[in-house]
Amino acid sequence: MATKLNKKDRLRQLKIEIDKNPFYTDDELAELFSVSVQTIRLDRMELGIPELRERIKNVAEENYHKVKAIVGSEIVGELIDLELGKSGISVFEPTPDMAFLKTKIIRGHYIYSQAESLAISVIDAEAALIGVANIKYKYPVRIGDRLVAKAEVIRKRGNKYFVWVMIKVKNKEVFRGKFILASLESDNTEKEVQ
């Protein structure tokens, strides 16, 4: 915003911005409106808009009931958007205990787990397993990074789902994976996955 808004206009615009993107941090909003973080927090309180973590949690809770293949609590990160059989988005903020002590870089299996659980969540099946995973870690993820994963079902052939997952930190791709998932019939879980 080029010019500073008066309080009434700022409150109105703040509501519009958070409605458009509920994942803005208070720091980002303060920069956007050229005010202090404290001013943004007071404005949010006045409008009854919860803090970022609560907004993410609220959006995620609306989506967990849609998931068929795994239990919502098994999803790594917060599931913020889900269209079964098509696409999904999750947000994950790794904690310091997930990092290597020396480098403060997040261990790869946490990043993979976010991608895997999102890939399983987006397919429209009662039970599924990863049959093939072709993954690439592109950049290190550090403590404090917020990972935004987007999954898309590219194709379905028989009981196989082809899902692409990209994970970004601040619009920079840090991980990508192509997964082939097998939908399992509930009475035949011993069937070969590939």
Curated annotation (Swiss-Prot):
Alphabetical list of InterPro entries matching this protein: HotDog_dom_sf (IPR029069), Thioestr_dom (IPR006683), Transcription_factor_FapR (IPR017275), WH-like_DNA-bd_sf (IPR036388)
Taxonomic lineage of the native organism: Bacteria, Bacillati, Bacillota, Clostridia, Thermoanaerobacterales
Protein known as: Transcription factor FapR
Keyword Signal in annotation: no
Highest taxon listed in the record's lineage: Bacteria
Protein purpose: Transcriptional factor involved in regulation of membrane lipid biosynthesis by repressing genes involved in fatty acid and phospholipid metabolism.
Any one Gene Ontology BP term: fatty acid biosynthetic process
UniProt key word Transcription: yes
Pfam families assigned: 4HBT (PF03061)
Similarity comment: family membership: Belongs to the FapR family.
Keywords, ordered alphabetically: DNA-binding, Fatty acid biosynthesis, Fatty acid metabolism, Lipid biosynthesis, Lipid metabolism, Repressor, Transcription, Transcription regulation
